Structures are given as structure tokens and as C-alpha cells.
Amino acid sequence: MSASTSTSTAASQDACYISLLGLAEYFRTSQPPNIKKCIQCLQALFTFMPPSKVEARTHLQMGQILMAYTKNIDLARQHLEKAWSISEPLPNFDVKFDTASLLAQLHLQTDKNSHQAKAMLRRAVELSQNNVYWHCKLLLQLAQIHASDREYSLASELLAVGAESADEASATYLKVLFLLSRAMILMIERKTNDVLALLNSAGQIIDNNIPNPHQKEYLKVFFLVLQVCYYLALGQVKTVKPSLKQLQMSIQTIMAPNWPSDEAIFGANQLEMFVWLPKEQLYVLVYLVTVSHSMMAGYMDKAQKYTEKALTQIEKLKQQEDKPILSVFKVILLEHIVMCRMVMGNRELAIREIAAARDVCMAAPQRTLLRRHSAQLHCLIGLYSMSTNLFEHAERQFVVCVSETSERDLKLFANLNLAIIYLRTKRDTDLKQILDAVSTENTHTYSSQALMGGFYYVQGLHAFHKNSFHEAKRFLRETLKMANAEDLNRLTSCSLVLLSHVFLSIGNSKESMNMVTPAMQLASKIPDIHVQLWGSAILKDLHRMSKDVQHEKDAYANHVKYSENLIADQRKCVQSAHHELVNWFQGDPPVTSGPPATPVLLMPESSVTSSVPVIASTSAAMQPAGQYGQFY
């Protein structure tokens, strides 16, 4: 065959490839897409015995189409594995990296564990060292899988490598993404000093070395979300306010109508084609951290308002594209709002929303969300059981929560509520054992102001029940000092009302009145029906002692009103189909039917509150996810 004939044949083949690829793309983008004909066009390419690179790329495209548009996962896997085997030995050929990334995703969807996905990505990371874009993208993907498997040290190491690679390539924007992603992992590990150092380093780079104002604003939002979560994890509700305000202003800037699209901001340079979250999801996330702050600060009405807005936004985004991260956001929001409902005495709504959270978890593929949130659901059901006086059920729920979780804050929160159950059921040996264990394990290792304040409160409650009033005052003053320093209003109101009861018990009516008055003012502002119930009983006794008949009648009327509200709500609870969830202790939660939760509300004893008076997020450490850096 002459050279001219050979060249002509090659040109003819190239024309066929281009025609078939063009036709395949035409069928794929038709309305509606004609995927069958698209696949037939790609399949026809193989009959021309194409060169290795064309063959590998076509197998990759077949795999992509099959994964995106069909349920034929096995055939998709075959094409991707063929693409990998052809492309792996070929130098300077990016198809191998795209294929490895997709194959890893497929393994995660179909395999029982992530071993094969990790092995595939490790090999691709090794091969991609001369291609900064793919090296960094694959490092992020591998780090995400390790983080999902709670292998945080490995995830952190990979992100550190990514930051170095980006730095060597002078990709400053990408370097900051790696630094902030690593800070997020270290936050989950509770390495607070390391988190602070990384945030400070990233913050300086954002301020001084990011020339593009739009990228700068995105990085600022990521940075501020982490900073807010950092302070909230420490229970520093007052300290966080300036950062939260700055975050809310930044997100308004990004959501403004004249703000460019994500594609326009990140599409020009390959090393800037990375975003943590698209702006619509960032918007939901800012609502979420605002809900968390409002709840911890004791502003239940605000928390409810922001939850409604966030859930509405989530539903809008789900209609456009149902991304898994939206379900994560929804579950965390529901977990927060459930606790708000219980503080306000709306337990029937709370159990409906627990059922809604269960439904979201059960709908996620391979029960991944249920595995991550099972302990939190047990904790919430424990709180619900406590509030409806089902102490045996509550105890079992908290024990399951403690056994299932590796989150130290959640474990402490559940244990403190167990201590209150043992106190109320007069199980002194169990109470002493759990308080000693909590004290030994947490006194020097816990840095959350809110939870440590809750620990001192429980000790004060214990001392009060032992009639050790001097000891009770000592613990409660410590609680008040911590609560007042950070505007933890619910902890303050609960401590004040208990301190008032202590003074009432020792006959100091003046000090008792000085404590119960601000307690009731705060409880009304929150609103906390349990503190209002307790405080109204104390006020009734104080007015009786001072022979103030009218005020005694008013206090008694308020006490009856709060009691009747709680008793009426209790009746609704026991009649609810979702009440059956109190009997879920293992495996998948039972399916219950009842009216759905809509984002909108018999504890007549007056001597103790229904649960630990610190609103601690029962969610795992805030682990928001992103397009190339999903950690949750």
C-alpha cells in the first residue's frame, strides 16, 4: 500500500470517528435524549479498529453514558475497566485519570467497602504527579473517601500533600482550598490548636494573595463557615457573633443578582476549576450554621424561622437536582429543630420531625446517612422519651447512642442526660458511676464551654437533691459564670431557676426571688416551657410566703397553664403513630405512618428540667460537603 493510500485511509477513518462522535453527541443532547442510538454510534466506532487512544476514550465515554443515563452498572464497569487497561500504560494521556475517578465512584456505589476505590485512586495519584490538575483532583477525591470512612489522619495527610502540590504550581487559590479542607478534617478530630493555626494561615493568604475578587469572596465564605463552626464547637456563642455576621454579609454578596455564575468565576484556569460548594448550597449552609448558633444561644423562635427558610431552599434545589449533600443538610436541620421543639414543649411535633429525619436517612443509597446519623437519632428519641416520662426507654436510647458514636461531644451529652435519668429515678450507684466517669474522662479534655457548663449544672442538680445546698450553689455559680461569658441563655435560665430553688429550700426568699425573676424573663424570651413551669411553682411559693395573694394566684394560674399545655401535648404524643419510635433500639428504625412534619409546636414536676439545659448539636461535627471536597 502506498503512503498516499495509507494517509487517505487514515483521514477517512478520522472522518468516520468524528462523524460517529458528533452523531452520538447529537442523540445524547436531543430532547428527550436518545441514549440507545447514542450508545449504538459509540459502539460502531469499535468496528473500525481505532487507535489505542481513541479506543480508550470511547470506552470511557460509553462508561460515562451508561452510568449517567442507565442502570446497567455492570456494562459501565466493563467499559471503564477496558478504558483503564488500555490507557494506564500510555504516557501523557489524561483519559486514565478520568477513568480512575469514575471507576472509584462506581466501586463506592456497588462494593460493600471502599478498598477497591481507594486502591484505584492511589494508583492514579501515583501516575498523575506530572499533571497538577488531575493530581490535586484525585487527592481530594481520595481524601474524601478516607474522611467518609473516619480515617481522618490519612485524609489530613493527603490534603497536606495537595497543598504542597498546589503551592509548587503557584496555584494559590487551590492551595487555600486544600488548607481549608484540611482545617475541616482537623476540626472533626478536635485538634483545636492545629485548626487555629491553619485558619490563620489560610486567612492571611485570602486577604493578601488572591487577586480575583470573586474567588476571594468564595474562599472567605468557606473560611468563615469553618471559623463559625470552630467557635460553636467550643460553645463560644458570644465570641462567634462578629464572624457569623461577616459570613451572612458575604453570602448576601455572593447571592446578589449581579454576581457572576460559578462557571464564569472558575472556568478560565484549569487549576481554579475547583469549588467547595456551589453558591446555592453555600446559601443553605449559612442558614444551617445560623440555626445552630440561634439554638445554642437559646433563641428558639429564630432557629425555627431560619430552619423553615433553609428547608424551603433545600426543596427548591432538590427539584432542580437531588444532590446527596442536600439530604445531609436536611437531616442536620431536622436534628436541630427537634431539640428546639422539645425545649418549647412541642414534643408531638418533635417526634414527627424525628420520623422525617429517619425517612431522609432511610432514602439515602446503601443506608449511608442512617449509619452516620443513627446515634444522633437515638439521642433525640432519648430526649423525647425523657420529656414524656418514659425513663426506661430514654435510658436505653442514650446507652445505644453512647455505644454507637465516636463523637466525644455527643457521648458527653448523652451521658449527662443519663445522669439526670438516674437522678430522677433515684439510682444513686449508677448516678455516681456515670458522674465519676464523665469527670475523669472529660474534665481536662473537653473544651466546649456549653457542655462543660452542662456538666457543672448536673452536678449542682445532684447536690441539690442530696440537700447539699452549699455544694449546689458552688457548682451552679460556676455554670452561671460559663453561661454568662458566652450568652448561653438556656443554660443561664436553668441555672438561675435551680439556684432560686436552692435559696427557697434554705429559707432565703429574697435571693430566691432575685434568681427566679431573671430566669423567668429569659425563659419567656427563649421560650422554655419547662423553666417557666418550674419558675411559676417557685414564684407561687414565694408569694405565698410573703402573703401576696394576688401574685400567688397569678403564679398559680401560669403554672396550671404551662402544666395543661404539656399534658395536652403528652396526649397527642402517645396517640401519634411515630411514638412507636421509642421502641427502636437496634437495626433499621421502624416505618411509622402519621401526619408529615411541616416546618412551622407531661412534665408537670417542678423540681428538675427535662434534660440537660445545654443545646448541644447532636449532629456529628459540622462536616459540610463540596463538589471536590466532600467530607461528611
Swiss-Prot record:
Belongs to the SCC4/mau-2 family. Keywords: Cell cycle, Cell division, Chromosome partition, Mitosis, Nucleus, Repeat, TPR repeat. Interacts with Nipped-B to form the cohesin loading complex. Transmembrane segments: none annotated. TPR repeats lie at residues 453-486, 493-526. This is MAU2 chromatid cohesion factor homolog. Gene3D superfamilies: Tetratricopeptide repeat domain (1.25.40.10). The keyword Secreted does not apply. Required for association of the cohesin complex with chromatin during interphase. Plays a role in sister chromatid cohesion and normal progression through prometaphase. The keyword Nucleus applies. It is found in: Nucleus, Nucleoplasm. One of its GO terms (cellular component) is chromatin. SUPFAM superfamilies: TPR-like (SSF48452). GO terms for biological process: cell division; chromosome segregation; maintenance of mitotic sister chromatid cohesion.
